[in-house]
């Protein structure tokens, strides 16, 4: 696949993993394909006796295609009464006999293959029913074959993975008879864990599970060689000696089913286990939600699109969590310092392997501190009991124990420990708050300023400068001095109603955010609201803001009040305890702590006093910090916040961001990095419709240019070179030198002493993890352990090393492998953090080891494909990075090909034993230059529902290619201050001009500070808008005629030769769909048409007026076609 697949102008074919994005083939049986000369395909099922059925006379029945042809020829010769028109009876009979004799086609059996009743053991997907080829799923009670058909793995493996089943039985008439596959040693039946070892003495194989049986030496027979252990499922198929793979001919004869149909069928089976493929065609099945848009007509349309997506995610989350009930739980009881009962328990070990349930609870259900769990006693030794508590401890590398603090310990059977059951208590609070915010945005005029309202909906609005007194010194007290790009960011943000700050890894965005909050608070416009999607991010920012000396209140959810954090002393509930101004409240609090309960009168008085104290603290605070969803807390409901800052906004969904925004935002600052991982959306349907794209991303695509922080202080300069060039256009400067990043007392032999990095070539094979939904690679795990041991021996401390991998299966396997197989003390390995790449976002370690896992022939590299995941992985380390992977599999993907070529050029692609590494001789295809776009990182926005093609039309105001002078508009619109030179001239040359109304204007001279530019910064009316939600008009107040009907409109220009075609994009009520020869559908607006009768002067006025619209190109749209290539490293 060419690298240009990442470029917006790419016309190359991009082949996707079917597991990542299933492709649906053309519907060749649709009505437009009804040709009378064609016969129906063999897989079409029709009722017996019907057309093509047994005894039927149709095209698919006995005789098949030939029957149709014979009938046609006979009709030409036989009249309506059946009498031969030429009277030559004998000749006609002879010809007819000859025609009938020619009808013995081999397809006879094939055509009736699916019209007859299939045996009960036929594959539920494709109908193949050879007993040697099929396997019975013990959970779903269905049969599946071991053939791939049109999918990336065999049908049985596809089903097991999608349905989360793990136990199978072979067919009684198959070569191995009716066999339940299970571990010879422990009886484990999870086929994803099972493998075989050939017994040396006998001609038999022994089935053993991967962990622990195949790896425990004490359990081994003298004839077993555990190094020979291989999984039963390889390349997503059962081994052919175990379950035969149907022949190619059999698979072609079978019913053809696509991966997308399989997905839909599996979803349907959850509701109706007896559903068939035919049921998928019924109306109402699998209705897709409406996709998110780039622009919205008004907030009602916005709510009508996002509301259903939030509900979809809520329903999915509820279903998932409420289905996870666990029995046979053993509880260990304890008493907390606050006199509340704490129950400790571990999830039971199952046949699926000991990490399976932990994976589901941590990854799928995202179990975290503060979640509610219901604990029930089901035994006979005490009365039946039920209690609800909040999670205060989750499983980690040290153990799988979960701890919950009970709300009330009344009746708790603390004397018994067995026969408990746990249920996850699903709470709709966060989803309710999102829905409420969407509604408020639509109906409440005071929820946000007019300017922000229109900007968020994508309307064109005159830019404004906020009237404020800029500080003489931008660095905040108690915080480090700012660099030039941070100063520019602070200075610009303070004067803008809406700002985006892009903070690449290690560029100090937390310090910048804290400084901005400090100056906003000093302006005295009431408390500043600071939010982030996660509690960890909120705590980090709260800590930094506190260092400036401001009065900060950290608002926690009530369910998290018992959880300790570095900023607990700033939490609202703890500050209330220390309020000297309310002695009565302190007295009642002390009584409650000692006795655990208060009388009803005292409790009522206590709550009233507490509410008063909370209100007083919140009103007098300079800054209030909480999560995005926490901003919907009733305690903030009556407060209005003029200034709101959302950190890590690229990790929040759009409705999540709206929860704080609707609390009166007049100045909104979004901080994040759209070149790193985006929000997590569990429901695939909602994610596909666009819920997985952040507000920050959409605003970037709309043309609001983020201010980028440009000096990184984390990585050794050698480590930052590749991410800077590939993800940030070479704009990152190093705030640390190579000498700053050499560890004292650390003696590790890097292949190149001045470059603390290498790619360790590993030839292992991937295996499906025990959960069936993840992967692991045992060879890579062994190499990771060796590298970790070498780092420890060289002088690194365990807590300075981070091991990251994209796959939960590998993370879990690594934790176990390090414990059982590490050559050093177990405690050392326990202190080494092992986590998924996604969980490590926002974190850093001195040394990072990345295990890539994927190594196969057919499956691709899964979500290693997401370049943002690679960006996060490569930018976590301060002193050194080691990548362990299979270059052959990875190099097929363009970005990884770049990385591998880069490592090879730097002579750090190595193989061989660790104590004698040598340069690898592997060769890769030469990478092409990645296309440089207007929107840095836009080519990596895999979650984007639309791309930034609007912003990269060659010859437009955006273009600065080397094929000619920039357009004259460039000099009028480019802000020279906006992009601070990154040093090397070739990098500076890649600065891309921005449309005038979206750029941060040059700072006005001191005498003009504080003056508004254009409409007041409050509720402005957008260009062409009659007011909030009003119908859009053109610049001259006239409704614009439909553009495609005008002879001189953009749609009528013949630009078919240009390589920028894009599907139709509907934006609000404006239909953007345009003819196929139009190379930029969606880029022109019907309201902004150029009428043919307009004189040149009038047209030029329109051109100037509309040149400030981010989508308008005028007659400059296609001056030339090139796009600047990205400068290499």
Swiss-Prot record:
What InterPro entries does the record tag this protein with? Answer: DNA2/NAM7-like, DNA2/NAM7-like_C, DNA2/NAM7_AAA_11, Helicase/UvrB_N, P-loop_NTPase, SF1_C_Upf1, UPF1_1B_dom, UPF1_CH/ZBD
Annotated consequence of substituting residue 676 to A: Impairs ATPase activity, no effect on ATP binding
Cellular localization per UniProt? Cytoplasm; Cytoplasm, P-body; Nucleus; Cytoplasm, Perinuclear region
Please give the superkingdom of this protein's source.
Eukaryota
Q: Which residues carry this modification: Phosphoserine?
A: 10, 31, 565, 956, 1089, 1107, 1110, 1127
Cite a single GO BP annotation.
mRNA export from nucleus
- Composition bias type Gly residues, residue spans: 52-69
Comment block on domains: The [ST]-Q motif constitutes a recognition sequence for kinases from the PI3/PI4-kinase family.
Subunit info here reads: Found in a post-splicing messenger ribonucleoprotein (mRNP) complex. Associates with the exon junction complex (EJC). Associates with the SGM1C complex; is phosphorylated by the complex kinase component SGM1. Part of a complex composed of SMG1, DHX34 and UPF1; within the complex DHX34 acts as a scaffolding protein to facilitate SMG1 phosphorylation of UPF1. Interacts with UPF2. Interacts with UPF3A and UPF3B. Interacts with EST1A. Interacts with SLBP. Interacts (when hyperphosphorylated) with PNRC2. Interacts with AGO1 and AGO2. Interacts with GSPT2.
Protein name as catalogued: Regulator of nonsense transcripts 1
Q: Which organism is it from?
A: Homo sapiens
Instruction: State the encoding gene.
Output: UPF1
């Amino acid at each position: 696949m060419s690298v240009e697949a990442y470029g917006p102008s790419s016309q190359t074919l991009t082949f996707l993993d079917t597991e990542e994005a299933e492709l649906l083939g053309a519907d060749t049986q649709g009505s437009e394909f009804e040709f009378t000369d064609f016969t129906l395909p063999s897989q079409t099922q029709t009722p017996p006796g019907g057309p093509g059925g047994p005894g039927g006379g149709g095209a698919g029945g006995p005789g098949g295609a030939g029957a149709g042809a014979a009938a046609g020829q006979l009709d030409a010769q036989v009249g309506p009464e059946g009498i031969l028109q030429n009277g030559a009876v004998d000749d006609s009979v002879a010809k007819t006999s000859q025609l009938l004799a020619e009808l013995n086609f081999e397809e006879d059996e094939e055509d009736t293959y699916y019209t007859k009743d299939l045996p009960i053991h036929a594959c539920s997907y494709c109908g193949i029913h050879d007993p040697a080829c099929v396997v019975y799923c013990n959970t779903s009670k269905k049969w599946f074959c071991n053939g791939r058909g049109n999918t990336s793995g065999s049908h049985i493996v596809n089903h097991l993975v999608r349905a989360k089943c793990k136990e199978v039985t072979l067919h009684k008439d198959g070569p191995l008879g009716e066999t339940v596959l299970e571990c010879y040693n422990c009886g484990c039946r999870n086929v994803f864990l099972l493998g075989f070892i050939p017994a040396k003495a006998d001609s038999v194989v022994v089935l053993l599970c991967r962990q622990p049986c195949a790896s425990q030496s004490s359990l081994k027979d003298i004839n077993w060689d555990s190094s020979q252990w291989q999984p039963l499922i390889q390349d997503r198929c059962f081994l052919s000696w175990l379950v035969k793979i149907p022949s190619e001919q059999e698979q072609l004869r079978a019913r053809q089913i696509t991966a997308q149909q399989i997905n839909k069928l599996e979803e349907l089976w959850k509701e109706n286990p007896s559903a068939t493929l035919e049921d998928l065609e019924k109306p109402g099945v699998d209705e897709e939600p409406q996709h998110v848009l780039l622009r919205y007509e008004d907030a009602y349309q916005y709510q009508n699109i996002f509301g259903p997506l939030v509900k979809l995610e809520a329903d999915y989350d509820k279903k998932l969590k409420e289905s996870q009930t666990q029995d046979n739980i053993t509880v260990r009881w304890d008493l907390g310092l606050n006199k509340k009962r704490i129950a400790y328990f571990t999830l039971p070990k199952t046949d699926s392997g000991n990490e399976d349930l932990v994976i589901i609870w941590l990854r799928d259900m995202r179990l975290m501190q503060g979640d509610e769990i219901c604990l029930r006693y089901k035994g006979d030794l005490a009365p039946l009991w039920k209690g609800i508590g909040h999670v205060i401890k989750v499983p980690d590398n040290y153990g799988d124990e979960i701890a919950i603090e009970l709300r009330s310990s009344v009746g708790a059977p603390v004397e018994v420990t067995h026969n408990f059951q746990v249920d996850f208590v699903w709470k709709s609070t966060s989803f309710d708050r999102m829905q409420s915010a969407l509604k408020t945005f639509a109906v409440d005029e005071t929820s946000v300023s007019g300017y922000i309202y229109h900007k968020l909906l994508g309307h064109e609005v005159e830019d404004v400068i906020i009237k404020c007194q800029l500080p003489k010194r931008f660095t905040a007290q108690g915080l480090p001095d700012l660099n030039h790009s941070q100063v520019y960011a602070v200075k610009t943000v303070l004067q803008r109603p809406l700002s985006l700050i892009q903070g690449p890894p290690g560029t100090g965005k937390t310090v910048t955010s804290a400084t901005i909050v400090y100056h906003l608070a000093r302006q005295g416009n009431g408390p500043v609201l600071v939010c982030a999607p996660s509690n960890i991010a909120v705590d980090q920012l709260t800590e930094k803001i506190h260092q400036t000396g401001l009065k900060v209140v950290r608002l926690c959810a009530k369910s998290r009040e018992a959880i300790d954090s570095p900023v607990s002393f700033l939490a609202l509930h703890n500050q209330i305890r220390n309020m000297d101004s309310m002695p009565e409240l302190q007295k009642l609090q002390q009584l409650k702590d000692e006795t655990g309960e208060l009388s009803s009168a005292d409790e009522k008085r206590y709550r009233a006093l507490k509410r008063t104290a909370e209100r007083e603290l919140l009103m007098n605070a300079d800054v209030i910090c909480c999560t995005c969803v926490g901003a919907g807390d009733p305690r903030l409901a009556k407060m209005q916040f003029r200034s709101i800052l959302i950190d890590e906004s690229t990790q929040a969904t759009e409705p999540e961001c709206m929860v704080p925004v609707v609390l009166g935002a007049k100045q909104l600052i979004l901080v994040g990095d759209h070149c790193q991982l985006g929000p997590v959306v569990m429901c695939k349907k909602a994610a596909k419709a666009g819920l997985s794209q952040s507000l920050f991303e959409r605003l970037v695509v709309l043309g609001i240019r983020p201010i980028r922080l440009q000096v990184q202080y984390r990585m050794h300069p050698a480590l930052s070179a590749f991410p800077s060039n590939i993800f940030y256009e070479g704009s990152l400067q190093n705030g640390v030198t190579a000498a700053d990043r050499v560890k004292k007392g650390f003696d590790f032999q890097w292949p190149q002493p001045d470059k603390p990095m290498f790619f360790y070539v590993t030839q292992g094979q991937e295996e499906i993890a025990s959960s069936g939904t993840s992967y692991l690679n045992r060879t890579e795990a062994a190499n990771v352990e060796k590298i970790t041991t070498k780092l420890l021996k060289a002088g690194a401390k365990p807590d300075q090393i981070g091991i990251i991998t994209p796959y939960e299966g590998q993370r879990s396997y690594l934790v176990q492998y390090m414990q059982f197989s590490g050559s050093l003390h177990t405690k050392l390995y326990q202190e080494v953090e092992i986590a998924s790449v996604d969980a490590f976002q926002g974190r850093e370690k001195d040394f990072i080891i990345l295990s890539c896992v994927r190594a196969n022939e057919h499956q691709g590299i899964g979500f290693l494909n997401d370049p943002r995941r690679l960006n996060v992985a490569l930018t976590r380390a301060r002193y050194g990075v080691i990548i362990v992977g299979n270059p052959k599999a990875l190099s097929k993907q363009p970005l990884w090909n770049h990385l591998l070529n880069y490592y090879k050029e730097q002579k750090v692609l190595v193989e061989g034993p660790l104590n004698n590494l040598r340069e690898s001789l592997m060769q890769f295809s030469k990478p092409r230059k990645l296309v440089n776009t207007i929107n840095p990182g836009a080519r990596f926005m895999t979650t984007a529902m639309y791309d930034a093609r609007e912003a990269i039309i060659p010859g437009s105001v955006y273009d600065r290619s080397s094929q000619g002078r920039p357009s004259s508009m460039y000099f009028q619109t480019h802000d020279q201050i906006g992009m601070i030179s990154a040093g090397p001239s070739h990098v500076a040359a890649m600065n891309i001009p921005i449309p005038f109304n979206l750029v941060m204007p040059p700072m006005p001279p001191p005498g003009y500070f504080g003056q508004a530019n254009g409409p007041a910064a409050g509720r402005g009316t957008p260009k062409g808008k009659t007011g909030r939600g009003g119908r859009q008009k053109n610049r001259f107040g006239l409704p614009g005629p439909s553009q495609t009907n005008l002879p001189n409109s953009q749609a009528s220009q013949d630009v078919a030769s240009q390589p920028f075609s894009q599907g139709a994009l509907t934006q609000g009520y404006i239909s953007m769909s345009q003819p196929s020869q139009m190379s930029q559908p969606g880029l022109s607006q019907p309201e902004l048409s150029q009428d043919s009768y307009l004189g040149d002067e009038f047209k030029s006025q329109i051109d100037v007026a509309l040149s400030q619209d981010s989508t308008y190109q005028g007659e400059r749209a296609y001056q030339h076609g090139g796009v600047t290539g990205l400068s290499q490293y």
